Curated annotation (Swiss-Prot):
Species: Drosophila sechellia
Gene3D superfamilies: Tetratricopeptide repeat domain (1.25.40.10)
Per-repeat ranges for TPR: 453-486, 493-526
Coiled coil residues, start to end: none
Protein's cellular compartments: Nucleus, Nucleoplasm
A GO biological process held by the record: cell division
Protein name (record): MAU2 chromatid cohesion factor homolog
Superkingdom of origin: Eukaryota
Self-association state and partner proteins as the record states: Interacts with Nipped-B to form the cohesin loading complex.
């Protein structure tokens, strides 16, 4: 064959490739898309025996189309594996990286574990060292998988490598993304000092070395979300306020109508084509951390208002595109609203929303959300069971929570609630054992100020029940000191009402009144029906002692009102189909459509153990500020 004939044949083949690719794209973008004909066009390319690079790219495109538009995962895998085997040895050919990234995603969808996905990405990371964009993208993808598997040290190491690679390429924006992502992992690991150092370093770069004002604002939102979560994890509700206010202002700036699209901000430079979350999702996340703050500060009305706004926004986004992270946000918000309902005495609504959270978890592919949130759901059902006097069920729920979770704050929270159960059921040996264990485990380790305040509160409650009033006062004053320092209003109100009861028990009616009055004011502001029930009983006794008949009548009337509200709500709980969830201890939670099966006491407790402070735990991996539960 002459050179001219060979050239003519090659040109003719190129024209065929281009025509078939153009036709395939035409069918793909038709309304509606004609995927069958699109695939036929791509398949036809192979009949021309194309060069290796064209063949590999076509196999990649086939894999992409099959994954995006069909359920034929096996065929998609075959094409992607073929693309990988052809492209892997070819130098300076990006198709291998795109293929590895997609194959890893496919392995995560279909395999029981992530070993193959990790192996594929590790190989691609090795091959991509001369391509900064793909090297960084693959490092982020691999670190995300390790983080999802709770292999935080490995995730952190990969993110550190990414920060170095971005730094060597003078990609400052990308470097800050890696630094902040690593700070998020270290926060989950409770490496408090390392988190602070990274946040300080990233903050200085954002302030001084990011010239693009739009990218700067995005990084600022990421930075402030982490800073707010850091303070909330420490239980520092008062300290966090300036950062939270700044975050709320920044998100308003980003959501303004004149703000450019994400594509316009991040589309110009390949090394800036990385976004932590699109602005619409950031908007929901800011609502979420605001809800977290309101819950911890004891502003239930605010928490409910922001939760409802966030859930509305999530539903709008789901209608556009149902991203998995929206379900994560929804579950965390539902966990918060459940806690609000129980503090306010709306337990029937709480169990309904626990069921809603269960439904979101069950709908996620491969039960991934249920695995991550099962312990939290058991904890919430434990709180619900406590509030309806089902102590045996509550105990089993908390024990399951402790056995399932690796989150130390959630474990501490569940154990403190177990201590309350043992106190109320007079199991002194179990109570002593759990308090000793909690004390030993948390003496020399980092814990939330709110949680540690709750620990002192439980010890004060225990001392009160032993009639060790001096010891009770000592523990409760320590609790008050911690609560007042950070505006933990519910912890404050519960401590004040218990202190009031301590003083009442030793006959000091003046100090008792001095404690119960601000407790009731705070409880009304929260509002916390359990503290109000308890406080009204104390006020009734105090007014009777001082022979103030009218105020005694008023206090008694209030006490009856709170009691009747709780009794009416408990009747609704018993009648709710979702009440059956109290019997879920293992496996998948039941679908609650049948009649309730558990008999429940209808008389609410008004004893001093009926209400204990809200304590918030920390987030699950890669999900900032996921908070769990309150004591009862």
């Amino acid at each position: 064959m002459s050179a001219s004939t060979s050239t003519s044949t090659a040109a003719s083949q190129d024209a065929c490739y281009i025509s078939l690719l153009g036709l395939a794209e035409y069918f793909r973008t038709s309304q509606p898309p004609n995927i069958k004909k699109c695939i036929q066009c791509l398949q036809a390319l192979f009949t021309f025996m194309p060069p290796s690079k064209v063949e590999a790219r076509t196999h990649l495109q086939m894999g992409q189309i099959l994954m995006a538009y069909t359920k034929n995962i096996d065929l998609a895998r075959q094409h992607l594996e073929k693309a990988w085997s052809i492209s892997e040895p070819l130098p300076n050919f990006d198709v291998k990286f795109d293929t590895a990234s997609l194959l890893a995603q496919l392995h995560l969808q279909t395999d029981r574990n992530s070993h193959q996905a990790k192996a594929m990405l590790r190989r691609a990371v090795e091959l991509s060292q001369n391509n900064v964009y793909w090297h960084c993208k693959l490092l982020l993808q691999l670190s995300q998988i390790h983080a999802s598997d709770r292999e935080y040290s490995l995730a952190s190491e990969l993110l550190a490598v990414g920060a170095e690679s971005a730094d060597e390429a003078s990609a400052t924006y990308l470097k800050v993304l890696f630094l902040l992502s690593r700070a998020m992992i270290l926060m989950i690991e409770r490496k408090t000092n390392d988190v602070l150092a990274l946040l300080n370093s990233a903050g200085q770069i954002i302030d001084n070395n990011i010239p693009n004002p739009h990218q700067k604002e995005y990084l600022k939102v990421f930075f402030l979300v982490l800073q707010v979560c850091y303070y909330l994890a420490l239980g520092q509700v008062k300290t966090v306020k300036p950062s939270l206010k700044q975050l709320q202002m920044s998100i308003q700036t980003i959501m303004a109508p004149n703000w450019p699209s994400d594509e316009a901000i991040f589309g110009a430079n390949q090394l800036e084509m990385f976004v932590w979350l699109p602005k619409e999702q950031l908007y929901v996340l800011v609502y979420l951390v605001t809800v977290s703050h309101s819950m911890m500060a004891g502003y239930m009305d605010k928490a409910q208002k922001y939760t409802e706004k966030a859930l509305t926004q999530i539903e709008k986004l789901k209608q556009q595109e149902d991203k998995p992270i929206l379900s994560v946000f929804k579950v965390i918000l539902l966990e918060h609203i459940v806690m609000c309902r129980m503090v306010m005495g709306n337990r029937e609504l709480a169990i309904r929303e626990i069921a809603a959270a269960r439904d979101v978890c069950m709908a996620a592919p491969q039960r991934s959300l249920l695995r991550r949130h099962s312990a939290q759901l058991h904890c919430l059902i434990g709180l619900y069971s406590m509030s309806t006097n089902l102590f045996e069920h509550a105990e089993r729920q908390f024990v399951v929570c402790v056995s399932e979770t690796s989150e130390r704050d959630l474990k501490l929270f569940a154990n403190l609630n177990l201590a309350i159960i043992y106190l109320r059921t007079k199991r002194d040996t179990d109570l002593k054992q759990i308090l000793d264990a909690v004390s030993t485990e948390n003496t020399h380790t980092y814990s939330s100020q709110a949680l540690m305040g709750g620990f002192y509160y439980v010890q004060g409650l225990h001392a009160f029940h032993k009639n060790s009033f001096h010891e009770a006062k000592r523990f409760l004053r320590e609790t008050l000191k911690m609560a007042n320092a950070e505006d933990l209003n519910r912890l404050t109100s519960c401590s004040l009402v218990l202190l009031s009861h301590v003083f009442l028990s030793i006959g000091n009616s003046k100090e008792s009144m001095n404690m119960v009055t601000p407790a009731m004011q705070l409880a009304s502001k929260i509002p916390d029906i359990h503290v109000q029930l308890w406080g009204s009983a104390i006020l009734k006794d105090l007014h009777r002692m001082s022979k103030d008949v009218q105020h005694e009548k008023d206090a008694y009337a209030n006490h009856v009102k709170y009691s009747e509200n709780l009794i009416a709500d408990q009747r609704k709980c018993v009648q709710s189909a979702h009440h059956e969830l109290v019997n879920w201890f293992q496996g998948d939670p039941p679908v609650t459509s049948g009649p309730p099966a558990v008999p429940v006491l209808l008389m609410p407790e008004s004893s001093v153990t009926a209400s204990v402070p809200v304590i918030a735990s920390t987030s699950a991996a890669m999900q900032p500020a996921g908070q769990y539960g309150q004591f009862y």
